[in-house]
C-alpha cells in the first residue's frame, strides 16, 4: 500500500500531487484498470507482443540517422 507523510506546513494539494505521482510510479492505476475486466491469456499475450514490437520500432527510429542533413 502506498502511503505518504504530510510534511509540516505542506498544503494538501501538494501532498495529493505527491501521492498521485507515487501511485503512478508504482503502476497501481494501470494494474487496477487491467483488472476491471477479464482478459483472455491469448489476448494478453497478443497485446504484450504488440507493445514490445512498438517499443522496438520506436527505439530503432530514434537510433537511425536522417538520410540527408541539408
From Swiss-Prot:
Gene3D superfamilies found in the cross-reference section: Ribosomal protein S8
GO annotation, biological process: translation
Pfam families the record matches: Ribosomal_S21
Gene Ontology cellular-component annotations: ribonucleoprotein complex; ribosome
Keyword Ribonucleoprotein among record annotations: yes
Compositionally biased spans, kind Basic residues: 45-61
Keyword list, A-Z: Ribonucleoprotein, Ribosomal protein
Entry GO MF terms: structural constituent of ribosome
Residue ranges, annotated region (Disordered): 39-70
Gene that encodes it: rpsU
Name of the protein in question: Small ribosomal subunit protein bS21
Family note: Belongs to the bacterial ribosomal protein bS21 family.
Species lineage: Bacteria, Pseudomonadati, Pseudomonadota, Betaproteobacteria, Burkholderiales
Amino acid at each position: 500500500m502506498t502511503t505518504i507523510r504530510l510534511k509540516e506546513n505542506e498544503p494538501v494539494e501538494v501532498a495529493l500531487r505527491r501521492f498521485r505521482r507515487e501511485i503512478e510510479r508504482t503502476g497501481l492505476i494501470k494494474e487496477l484498470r487491467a483488472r476491471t475486466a477479464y482478459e483472455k491469456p491469448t489476448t494478453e499475450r497478443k497485446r504484450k507482443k504488440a507493445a514490445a514490437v512498438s517499443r522496438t520500432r520506436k527505439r530503432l527510429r530514434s537510433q537511425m540517422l536522417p538520410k540527408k542533413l541539408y
